[in-house]
């Protein structure tokens, strides 16, 4: 029986310090996998952040370019612009363009009794010297002429306003003609203008069309004005 149970007859494996149980190996492998997963997750987040930053940068650049183009178009469009000069205006003069707000004065006003008051076109005391003799008195050709002249001046003043407000700087050169041995203004030059047909259509519709502004209550129309409105036969 000793030969079966003798300790000397059995081989025992030595457990060296480097030998690790299977359960501990699985724990280390799990931890390693978790660490690798964490690293991959962090990497994906970093890639996502970088992509978002890159996309944001590209979007910001695109918006900046678009805004720059819009400003460029407004300033240097195909036809130019009012504050920076139109296409056919003199280049050297464009740099002196400055915008300002200006109120023109001198429009006639009418009192309830029909009296017409014509103030001076510029601020200051009224110049009444000689006005009574020019526009008031016995009917005469001279008196009628003075009133007509005043009406013409009023119309010319409106033309002056339009010229001053537009301030067209398109050069109008002179051209030499042998027949007269002199220079003469050559006005056949292109200008940047508003389409008058469109403006006229708007004015007509605004005056007597679907977009007409209603008259103030109590307004009494004269026959010429009624003809303009089309509510009085010729």
Swiss-Prot record:
Keywords: Glycoprotein, Membrane, Oxidoreductase, Transmembrane, Transmembrane helix, Virulence. Its EC number is 1.-.-.-. The chain crosses the membrane at residues 47-69. The keyword Zinc-finger does not apply. It comes from the Eukaryota. Glycans are attached at residue 208. It holds the Pfam family UstYa. The keyword Lipoprotein does not apply. It is found in: Membrane. One of its GO terms (molecular function) is oxidoreductase activity. Residues 1-26 are annotated as: Disordered. GO terms for biological process: mycotoxin biosynthetic process. Pathway: Mycotoxin biosynthesis. A motif (HXXHC 1) lies at residues 151-155. It is a single-pass membrane protein. It is an enzyme of class 1 (oxidoreductase). GO terms for cellular component: membrane. The 2 HXXHC motifs are conserved in ustYa family proteins and might form active sites. UstYa family oxidase; part of the gene cluster that mediates the biosynthesis of the phomopsins, a group of hexapeptide mycotoxins which infects lupins and causes lupinosis disease in livestock. Within the pathway, phomYd' catalyzes the desaturation of the Asp moiety into 2,3-dehydroaspartic acid (dAsp). The pathway starts with the processing of the precursor phomA' by several endopeptidases including kexin proteases as well as the cluster-specific S41 family peptidase phomP1 and the oligopeptidase phomG' to produce 10 identical copies of the hexapeptide Tyr-Val-Ile-Pro-Ile-Asp. Belongs to the ustYa family. This is UstYa family oxidase phomYd'. It comes from Diaporthe leptostromiformis (Lupinosis disease fungus).
């Amino acid at each position: 029986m000793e030969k079966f149970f003798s300790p000397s007859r059995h081989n025992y494996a030595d457990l060296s310090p480097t030998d690790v149980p299977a359960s501990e190996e699985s724990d280390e492998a799990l931890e390693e996998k978790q660490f690798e997963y964490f690293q991959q997750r962090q990497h994906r987040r970093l890639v996502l952040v970088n992509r978002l930053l890159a996309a944001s940068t590209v979007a910001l650049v695109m918006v900046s370019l678009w805004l720059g183009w819009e400003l460029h178009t407004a300033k240097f469009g195909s036809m130019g612009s009012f504050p920076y000069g139109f296409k056919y205006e003199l280049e050297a003069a464009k740099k002196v363009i400055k915008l300002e707000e200006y109120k023109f004065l001198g429009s006639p006003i009418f009192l309830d009794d029909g009296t017409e008051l014509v103030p001076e076109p510029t601020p200051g005391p009224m110049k009444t010297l000689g006005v009574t003799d020019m526009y008031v008195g016995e009917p005469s050709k001279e008196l009628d002429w003075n009133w007509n002249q005043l009406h013409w001046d009023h119309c010319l003043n409106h033309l002056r306003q339009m010229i001053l407000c537009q301030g067209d700087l398109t050069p109008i050169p002179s051209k030499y003609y042998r027949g007269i041995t002199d220079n003469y203004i050559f006005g056949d030059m292109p200008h940047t203008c508003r389409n008058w047909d469109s403006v006229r259509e708007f004015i007509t519709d605004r005056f007597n069309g679907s977009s007409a502004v209603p008259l103030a209550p109590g307004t009494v129309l004269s026959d010429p004005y009624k003809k303009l409105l089309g509510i009085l036969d010729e």
